[in-house]
């Protein structure tokens, strides 16, 4: 009898071409790597449903995915079964059997991302794949002031990668926290959903505010323009982490 199993996954996206598997099977992705592990453990071909399509180089602290299986492996034991076949940069933190109708993507009601910045004159070779280096001191208060303009429901067309054919570019950001501890700055962004590159462009724009290249109130003008060219840079993928997903 078919069952539905949910996974909670942590991964280092450095050596992967994002989450989503590609037609070219030689391209390494997180999804294809976990599917291979499931097939090794169950001897079944499965389709792994992901909660979000993270880009190449983006990391995840608590990614949710699910798959249907006829395997008799108990739900809570799948994490052990799969971790045996996974590389060291992917780990299943939790596994459990869930109702058949559960869908990792469609049932997700909110997400939190965190963008990490190393704010000091010298970069860190050890952290180079996990944090974005900004050598000049950031004005955190200005960044916090700018972030307030992003809270709420807006058309975020200016904060997405150009192109695409979406029904709507309206999204709701529920909270942005900008924290600094020693030389580490973190931008935590929570919302009901995000457009392609949205969190990276928001982070890049807030960094430009922190470097006094823009004023905090410029954010309002950028939103109203709905023009990608008006917003700031798309911050590098290596600093971005999918931190948390929310379900009813």
Swiss-Prot record:
UniProt KW Cell membrane keyword: no
Record has Chloroplast as a keyword: no
Residues binding substrate: 113
Gene3D superfamilies membership: Pseudouridine synthase I, catalytic domain, C-terminal subdomain (3.30.70.660), Pseudouridine synthase I, catalytic domain, N-terminal subdomain (3.30.70.580)
A biological-process GO annotation: tRNA pseudouridine synthesis
EC number per UniProt: 5.4.99.12
Active-site residues, record numbering mapped to chain: 55
Reaction(s) catalysed by this chain's protein: uridine(38/39/40) in tRNA = pseudouridine(38/39/40) in tRNA
Top EC class, one word: isomerase
Pfam family, one: PseudoU_synth_1
Molecular function as annotated in GO: RNA binding; tRNA pseudouridine(38-40) synthase activity
Similarity annotation: Belongs to the tRNA pseudouridine synthase TruA family.
Oligomer and partners: Homodimer.
Biological function: Formation of pseudouridine at positions 38, 39 and 40 in the anticodon stem and loop of transfer RNAs.
NCBIfam families xref list: hisT_truA
Protein name: tRNA pseudouridine synthase A 2
Organism lineage string: Bacteria, Bacillati, Bacillota, Clostridia, Eubacteriales
The encoding gene: truA2
